[in-house]
Design a protein with these regions (language model features):
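N-terminal secretory signal peptides that target proteins for export/translocation
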Residues: 1-8
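N-terminal targeting signals for export/organelle localization
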Residues: 17, 28-96
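Solvent-exposed, acidic/flexible segments
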Residues: 38, 42, 46, 53, ...
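C-terminal cap of thioredoxin/glutaredoxin-like
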Residues: 41-53, 59, 70-75, 203-276
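Structural alpha/beta surface segment adjacent to cysteine/selenocysteine redox centers
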Residues: 119, 130-206, 236-241
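The canonical Cys-X-X-Cys-His
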Residues: 123-132, 244-247
Length: 276
């Protein structure tokens, strides 16, 4: 029977494979020599350590505390490997299902005939979206000529998020090229925007050469409302919930997965497009 400690903390037993490398437990004085033959057979160092941990479970917490950074690193690596494995399996299924998205009236970053298209569904007030923007910009640099990107605002229901989406969408409609500058400024200054509201939008727009009255009028126009509604319904049809979300050709990527997984997604898309 397991000690009460393990019955009340069942997850601790699962940590043994990670803990054993850290444990340095000397055999008791005058005890049997490890590796000697006994009635139960040869006793290994690993078995001795495991037995010691079971007999003194408080050592488990001591080992965790003393090696907390290393244990955390191992856990993070394991989580990353598990997530990568799951994504690779998902992507093999994704490429078999064509995703239908509207792109003909959108502004792009990257070469027009790039073999890989990334559609970013994002929110200007989402911290994970801001984090992912940095990775996306690096991807565009690394895969210059092979990757293009467009942006679709997917705001939350709160007015701060919705207003940012309306103004950014209007900026693209008024000037598809300058719209990217507004997009960048809004992401880079999102915290300031959340503090200042429309005043930040006005300063940003005017610094980029927009007529703010025209921009504000466009932001509240039926054209902007229709585009945002369309993109929201498109996201629903794709099974997208939450931001950020990315469609890389037909591969679905949810969340700010980090540079390495983004690169793997692009490489996978290139391979299936025959352009690697």
């Amino acid at each position: 029977m397991k000690p009460a400690f393990f019955r009340t903390h069942p997850y601790i037993s699962l940590l043994f494979p990670c803990l054993l490398p850290f444990a340095s437990i000397a055999p008791p004085a005058c005890g049997p020599v490890l590796g000697a033959q006994t009635g139960a057979g040869e006793v290994s160092v690993r078995e001795a350590v495991r037995r010691e941990l079971h007999e003194h479970p408080e050592l488990v917490l001591d080992i965790l505390k003393e090696n907390s950074e290393t244990v955390l690193e191992i856990a993070q690596q394991g989580n990353m490997l598990r997530r990568r494995k799951s994504l690779l399996a998902q992507w093999e299924q994704d490429v078999k299902q064509r995703k239908i998205v509207k792109l003909d009236d959108r502004s792009f970053r990257g070469k027009a005939d790039a073999p890989v298209t990334m559609v970013v569904y994002s929110d200007f007030t989402c911290p994970y979206c801001r984090q992912a923007e940095y990775d996306v910009s690096r991807l565009l640099q690394k895969y210059d000529g092979k990757l293009r990107m467009t942006f679709k605002a997917l705001p939350k229901e709160d007015p701060v998020s919705a207003t940012a989406a309306k103004f950014a969408t209007a900026a693209f409609l008024l000037d598809p090229v300058k719209g990217w500058e507004f997009h960048d400024a809004l992401f880079n200054g999102s915290e300031q925007y959340e503090r200042e509201g429309e005043e930040f939008l006005k300063k940003t727009a005017e610094s980029l050469g927009y007529d703010f009255k025209k921009l504000k009028s466009a932001a509240n126009s039926p054209a902007v409302r229709q585009r945002l509604d369309f993109d929201g319904k498109e996201a629903d049809n794709l099974g997208i919930s939450g931001t950020p979300h990315f469609l890389i050709n037909d591969l679905m990527v949810r969340g700010a997965v980090g540079r390495e997984l983004f690169e793997e997604a692009v490489e996978t898309a290139l391979r299936h497009a025959g352009k690697q």
